[in-house]
């Protein structure tokens, strides 16, 4: 990641189905309008957190601990938005 403001968090997937298509779409949508780069890591794999398809390739099930790294001007706001989405089970339940 480039040298810019950044933030990092470990987020546990608590929704029933883990990081599936709809959850990935909600995750990406939470970043809309924010000037950030996002990397999401799980079990040794790292993907672009702004890409729904990349997130889906992780196949992370319920209970997975994701490492989320955010950089850019809106890093803190982005991490807060992503944390809210995950903590609210991607608004599924």
Model regions and ranges:
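Amphipathic, hydrophobic secondary-structure cores in small proteins
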Residues: 19-21, 25-81
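N-terminal acidic, proline/glycine-rich, low-complexity intrinsically disordered segments
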Residues: 1-3
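A common structural junction motif
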Residues: 85-92
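Short amphipathic
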Residues: 5-15
């Amino acid at each position: 990641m480039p040298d810019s403001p950044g933030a990092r968090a470990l987020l546990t997937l608590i929704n029933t189905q883990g990081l599936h298509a709809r959850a990935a779409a909600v995750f990406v949508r939470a970043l809309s309008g924010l000037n950030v780069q996002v990397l999401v890591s799980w079990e040794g794999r790292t993907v672009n957190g702004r890409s729904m398809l990349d997130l889906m390739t992780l196949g992370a099930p319920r209970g997975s601990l994701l490492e989320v790294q955010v950089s850019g001007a809106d890093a803190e706001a982005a991490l807060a938005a992503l944390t809210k989405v995950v903590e609210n089970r991607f608004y599924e339940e």
